[in-house]
């Protein structure tokens, strides 16, 4: 099998690359490890895209300029990302939504609500599944070949340049030759053995929010072949999910957004982090690592009646009780310790106008750890509780790329091997996360990689 461009992966970044290469008139094959009904990688579960814009649009409110976007990114990652790639990502994010719409992707009208995202993020109508269906429909119309249940088991590289790949599909092995290739196969979060190398036994208690097919095979092939690594094996997008979620592929409905509205305690009934440190889209992805550091990698969110209706609930019902003590017992927590924690928290709360849309003045004083915003006493029945575990979305260890999205092999950018999406996200994300930026990385670098591969295949 011979093509101009081979794209490995089947999510947003991969399809953006495939469509961009096809736009340039190249023959393209997409090698998707998942079966057809599971196609799309983690993009199946996405909801929105973060993008800079200078004025309100049909799908975004207000303005979100490049400098503010960059400031937000630096705030969550400590300014450790590749500065040139970060700036380019933000500048090119302006083009993403119109380009997606050309391929049948539809967006919701601008939304307002508790997620603080109406100004910064455009939401997909129908979510990630509709997004990926639109892309695959466009790929079919344009004559892009797609191999499902197909895993790249080896790459034939010559001095850092791509020549061919051996792909296992349907119990057979095929060799795909291509003049250029794009690797967009995600991270290794579904590979529990690899996670244990970084996290130890704690990884056994992680829940994988997305696809079970991101086991890092192509990433390992590239690193073993001399690709320059970027990022840390422990760095990842990880949030707090309902502990009752399935081990794989639970998606957005297992996420818990109630943490800023209450308190979070560990198995000993003790608080361990500031639940109100920052607005939720800039803070939610820190909670997975925080919970992972607790005994048994488990925690519990406690809220009272004042919070009910203010957050998107888990797909699983809350534990409900008429008192804090009874709630602690229902959650198998030490009731005296939980009661003392709640009493200390309530005594430390300083009243102010409550506003979940801003960094309000509702805070604690003299409490460690503090709650910096949205602190209200837990004093109104019924009381709700949710068990939490770390929910990993994707890992940040990946391959280094240049500004053309070429993989840096043995210190030199490859002439025809590109990477996009989570497999190279560590160039931009070293720590933390901004809601929707994963889709931005996939779209911007997917398009860039596809166009670059098309040029290399001339």
Name each model feature, range by range.
Residues 27, 33-145, 151, 262-271, ...:
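Conserved N-terminal/central alpha/beta ligand/cofactor-binding core
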Residues 172, 176-242, 439, 448:
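Glycine-rich loop(s) and the adjacent beta-strand/alpha-helix scaffold that form part
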């Amino acid at each position: 099998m011979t093509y101009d461009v081979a794209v490995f992966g089947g999510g947003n970044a991969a399809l953006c690359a495939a469509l961009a290469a096809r736009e340039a008139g190249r023959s393209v094959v997409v090698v998707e490890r998942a079966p057809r009904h599971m196609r799309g990688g983690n993009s199946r579960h996405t909801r929105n895209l973060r993008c800079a814009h200078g004025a309100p649009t049909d799908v975004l409110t207000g303005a979100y300029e490049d400098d503010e976007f960059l400031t937000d990114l630096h705030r969550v990652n400590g300014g450790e990302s590749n500065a040139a790639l970060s700036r380019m990502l933000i500048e090119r994010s302006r083009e993403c939504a119109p380009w997606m719409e050309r391929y049948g992707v539809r967006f919701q009208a601008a939304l307002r609500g508790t997620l603080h995202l109406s100004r910064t993020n455009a939401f997909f109508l129908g979510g990630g599944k509709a997004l990926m269906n639109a892309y695959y429909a466009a790929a079919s119309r344009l004559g892009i070949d797609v191999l499902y249940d197909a895993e790249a088991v080896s790459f034939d590289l010559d001095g850092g340049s791509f020549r061919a790949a051996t792909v296992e599909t349907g119990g057979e092995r095929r060799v795909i030759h291509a003049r250029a290739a794009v690797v967009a196969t995600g991270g290794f979060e579904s590979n529990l053995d690899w996670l244990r190398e970084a996290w130890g036994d704690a990884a056994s208690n992680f829940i994988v929010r997305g696809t079970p097919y991101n086991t890092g095979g192509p990433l390992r092939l590239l690193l073993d072949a001399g690709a320059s690594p970027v990022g840390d094996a422990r760095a990842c997008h990880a949030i707090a999910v309902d502990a009752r979620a399935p081990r794989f592929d639970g998606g957005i409905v297992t996420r818990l957004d109630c943490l800023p509205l209450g308190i979070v305690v560990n198995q000993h009934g003790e608080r361990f982090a500031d639940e109100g440190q920052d607005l939720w889209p800039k803070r939610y992805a820190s909670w997975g690592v925080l919970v992972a550091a607790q005994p048994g990698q488990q925690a519990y969110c406690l809220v009272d009646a004042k919070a009910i209706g203010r957050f998107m609930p888990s797909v699983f019902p809350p534990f409900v009780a008429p008192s804090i003590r009874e709630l602690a017992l229902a959650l198998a927590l030490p009731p005296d310790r939980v009661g003392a924690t709640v009493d200390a928290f309530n005594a430390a709360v300083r009243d102010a106008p409550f506003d979940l849309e801003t960094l309000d003045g509702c805070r604690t004083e003299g409490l460690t750890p503090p709650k910096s915003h949205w602190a209200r006493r837990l004093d109104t029945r019924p009381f709700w509780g949710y068990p939490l575990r770390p929910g990993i979305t994707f890992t940040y260890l990946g391959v280094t790329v240049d500004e053309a999205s070429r993989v840096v092999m043995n210190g030199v950018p490859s002439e025809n091997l590109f990477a996009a999406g989570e497999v190279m996200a560590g160039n931009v994300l070293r720590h933390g996360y901004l809601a929707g930026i994963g889709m931005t990385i996939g779209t911007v670098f997917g398009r860039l990689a596809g166009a670059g591969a098309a040029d290399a295949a001339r």
